[in-house]
Structure formats: C-alpha cells, structure tokens
C-alpha cells in the first residue's frame, strides 16, 4: 500500500494537474462537453483492478501488460494526433522524435493516473475502501484522465505537431521571410492571446523560442510566413515582455517552448514529468520499442545511409496476402512479409535499436527483410520476367543480400549477429541456389570479394532480365579457372551457373568437379 508521505506527495501533484486542466484554461466543444476519442475504458478498468490486487503502483509495473495496455491505448490517440498532423514531406527522423515524445508523455500520464487509482484504495478513515466505492472512484479517474484531460492533450498534440512541421519549413527559408503571430480572431480568442496577434519578427528572433503556439490548452493560434516589408516589424523586447506577462502564472509558464525547435509535442515542465527517475527510465526504454510497421518504416528512414537502400523510397511494411512466400516487394518501397516474420522484424529492430542481441528467429526474419530491401536497390525497377530469368534474379539478389548482412547490422551501430545466415539460410527457397553459386566460386578459385562486388553492381544497376549475365561475368572476371589452371570460357561458366538452379548441393558438387576436370 502507498505510504503516508507518498500519498501526500501525489495528492499535491494531483492537485497541480487538476489546476493545470481547470475549466477556465480549457476551451471546450460548443456543447460544453468534451468529445469521446474512443479511449477503451475497459483497458483502464482492467489495469485498475490489477493495481487493486497489487496494492498500488511501482515504476517497474509499467513494464507489465496491464500498464502497457493503458500506455499503448493512450499513445494510439496522442500518437495518432501527431502522425495525422504532419505531411509526408516532414523528415522521418523529426516525425520519430515527436512521436517518441508523445509516447513518453503517454507513459508518464499512465503512471500518474494509475497512481491515483492506487491512492483511491484507501478511504479517508485510513481503511480499505469497499469494492463498489473503489470502482466508482476508478470510473471518475478514467473520465478525468482519459476523456477530459485527453481532449486537451489531443488538441495540443495536433497544434504542436503542426507548428513543429511549420518550424521545420521556416528554418529552410531562414530570415528571407518574417514570421507573424495570428489568433483565430473570433469571439473565442483569449484576451491574453489577442495581445500577441500580429506580432511580426524574423524567424531568428528569440521571441519564437518561447511563444510559438500553442500557448495554452486548445490554443488555436498559428504562425505564418510574411514577406519582409509587408508588415512593420515588432519590437522584440516588447514582444517578449508581452509573452512573459501573459504566461506569468506557473500553470501557463509551462507552455513557454517551441515544439519545432525542441522537437517535443508536450512541454518538459508538465506535472506528469515529476514522476520518479525509475519510472522515467522505464518509459524511455519502452519508447524505443518498435511496435508497428509504420514505426519500423520511420526508424529505417531516420538515417541517410538507410534511406539510400531504397531507390524509390521506403513507403510501407505490411502483412503479405500471398501464400507460400516469406516476403515480397513491388520494388517501389512497399514490402510485405508474413505476420510471423513481420512481428520478428519489429522485435529484432527494437533490440538492435537498444543495442541488444537478436534471437535466431529474429535474425532469420531480419535476413528476409534485408532480402526485400536489396530488391529495392535496383535502379531500373520491376519488369516482366520469364521463369528462368526470375530464378537468376533471385539467385543474384539473395547472394548479395546474405553476403552484405553485416552492412545491415552496422547501420544500427552494432556488429553482425548470427553470421551463419551469410552462408546458409534454410528458410528461403533460394538457399540451394546460393550455396551452389558460392561452391562454384570456391571450386573455380574466383576471388569471392571481386565476385560479390561485381554481382552487386550488376544487380543494382542493370535490368533484372540481365542478371544471368552479371552472375557469369562476375566469375569470369574474378579469376575462375579449371582444375589445371586453364581459364574458364564464358560458355562453360554459363552452363555451370545454370546448374546452380538445377541441382541439389551434392549433385552440383559432383557436376562441377567433373566439369572442371575436363580438358
């Protein structure tokens, strides 16, 4: 059960939160009621019952399913507010930072709301509350946090994200334009915000570091670019003075920040952030988890070297509808995978992001993912292929993909894991073909590094219908010879490469040995 000092601290913190969200600070819907964002109250009720059974909340409990479900449900709404407010032109790394902040906010909000549930276990007389009374209080806490507060937080997330995106655009133009603060200019505008209306200053002015909208819950103010000289520039010190004056109260002062410059949706001084350091660390680690395909796409896009993996951009990662495949791609940045492999890709990417070790199954799924990424590096793009041409293409693609797996892992700041997949990946139907090709390289004495470089260059730059040519030429130009040292002819290598597709490994080895021994 919560201690007396703990209860006193959180009662005070709860009062601070309630003061921050008091009605006069919220501009509610026209009917005076906050809209329902579809938060699933059953999730909160299950978590509340779990808290009752555990006798309270500790930071470590945030990692357990009941609390995680509340965090995820909160983030579903607040994260959706962020993603729906930003255009596709916004760099993925910036979008990722904003969504990360919304997740952390969701986690700390959950910790605070569940702590209030824990406090409600004890009545004013110091005894355990009756079951019915406890659940009445839970319903009130749910309505307060997951409807009333959530309404203000959702609107704030929308405006903050929009202003962050605008700020990114403003930065591209520098001081070529001035920025002008504008209210909605109607009867609902707050008097203090009206005082900021039409303030016009360069983008580099310190005013924008503190008073970029939103400047309060449900603030509808915006900032727009205007041509220099069209409007008189405001006095910077006077503008800052007005901003400081209208946000002098502590509960208003928390909005003194620039979401675009700080790349945060919610201000650091929000009372939720007064959670224990242990809770903050756990939530920060949870925020690194990649739980959805959309998050995986953005994570891959965060770095320029990873964006270069896609000739036509990385757009979607989805569950495949095709049967009998591990994955597929249209080579236009859309990758499909089986549900099982996709889930393992997400968990594997999470571990790589956190510097952890991936499992054998995750490494296998990541190898499939890398195979499909490698397809997207082909410059000419998809085209109709005969069955034989497609087999040559898949041989070349899987050969390059598995031999360059270290590049994939190194892009996340780590070393190659499960290197066995560079030589043998039995989950793919192309495994025998590739192992035969690697055997051919060894038996002919061709330089494996030169072969890889040549096949890779041909795979990325030439039409898929011509990949047989690349596979043959790579071995020819890398010193391939017969057993007696006689250089192999192109026609001989063609026959041997075709054999990679026709025979099992043992039969292929015998076939190559016989072919290389012939004079």
Feature names for model-found ranges:
Residues 150, 362, 366, 389, ...:
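Hydrophobic (often cysteine-bearing) scaffold residues that line and stabilize catalytic clefts
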Residues 387-433:
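Post-HExxH zinc-binding segment in Zn-dependent metallohydrolases
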Residues 363-383, 398, 402:
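Active-site recognition of the HExxH zinc-binding catalytic motif
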């Amino acid at each position: 059960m919560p201690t007396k000092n703990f209860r006193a601290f959180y009662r005070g913190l709860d009062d601070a939160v309630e003061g921050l969200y008091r009605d006069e600070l919220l501009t509610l819907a026209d009917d005076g009621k906050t809209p329902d964002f579809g938060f699933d109250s059953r999730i909160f009720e299950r978590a509340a019952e779990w808290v009752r059974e555990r006798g309270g909340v500790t930071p470590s409990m945030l990692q357990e399913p009941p609390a995680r479900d509340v965090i995820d449900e909160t983030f579903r709404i607040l994260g959706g507010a962020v993603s729906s407010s930003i255009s596709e032109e916004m760099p993925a790394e910036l979008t990722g930072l904003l969504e990360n902040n919304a997740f952390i906010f969701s986690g700390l909000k959950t910790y605070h709301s569940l702590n209030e549930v824990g406090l409600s276990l004890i009545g004013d007389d110091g005894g355990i509350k009756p079951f019915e009374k406890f659940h009445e209080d839970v319903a009130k806490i749910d309505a307060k946090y997951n409807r009333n507060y959530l309404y203000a937080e959702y609107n704030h997330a929308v405006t903050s994200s929009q202003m962050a995106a605008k700020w990114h655009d403003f930065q591209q133009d520098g001081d070529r334009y001035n920025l002008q603060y504008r209210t909605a200019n109607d009867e609902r505008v707050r008097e203090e915000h009206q005082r900021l209306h039409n303030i016009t200053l360069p983008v580099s002015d310190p005013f924008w570091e503190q008073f970029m909208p939103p400047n309060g819950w449900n603030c509808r103010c915006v900032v727009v670019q205007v041509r220099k000289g069209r409007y008189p520039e405001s006095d910077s010190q006077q503008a800052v003075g007005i901003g400081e004056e209208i946000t002098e109260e502590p509960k208003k002062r928390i909005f003194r920040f620039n979401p675009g410059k700080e790349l945060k949706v919610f201000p650091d001084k929000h009372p939720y952030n007064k959670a224990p350091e242990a809770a903050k660390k756990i939530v920060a680690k949870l925020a690194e988890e990649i739980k959805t395909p959309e998050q995986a796409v953005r994570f891959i896009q965060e770095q320029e070297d990873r964006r270069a993996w896609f000739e036509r951009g990385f757009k979607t990662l989805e569950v495949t509808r095709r049967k009998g495949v591990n994955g597929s791609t249209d080579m236009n940045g859309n990758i499909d995978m089986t549900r099982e492999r996709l889930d393992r890709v997400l968990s594997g990417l999470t571990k790589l992001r956190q510097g952890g070790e991936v499992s054998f199954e995750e490494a296998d799924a990541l190898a499939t993912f890398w195979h499909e990424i490698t397809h997207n590096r082909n410059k000419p793009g998809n085209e109709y292929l005969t069955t034989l041409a497609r087999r040559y293409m898949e041989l070349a693609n899987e050969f390059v993909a598995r031999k360059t797996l270290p590049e994939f892992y190194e892009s996340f700041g780590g070393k190659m894991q499960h290197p066995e997949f560079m030589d043998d990946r039995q989950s793919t139907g192309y495994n025998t073909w590739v192992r035969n090709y690697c055997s051919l390289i060894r038996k002919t004495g061709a330089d494996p590094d030169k072969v890889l470089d040549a096949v890779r260059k041909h795979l990325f730059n030439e039409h898929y219908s011509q990949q047989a040519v690349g596979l043959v030429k790579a071995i020819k130009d890398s010193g391939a010879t017969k057993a007696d040292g006689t250089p192999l002819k192109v026609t001989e290598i063609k026959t041997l490469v075709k054999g990679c597709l026709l025979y099992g490994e043992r039969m292929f080895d015998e076939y190559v040995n016989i072919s290389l021994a012939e004079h």
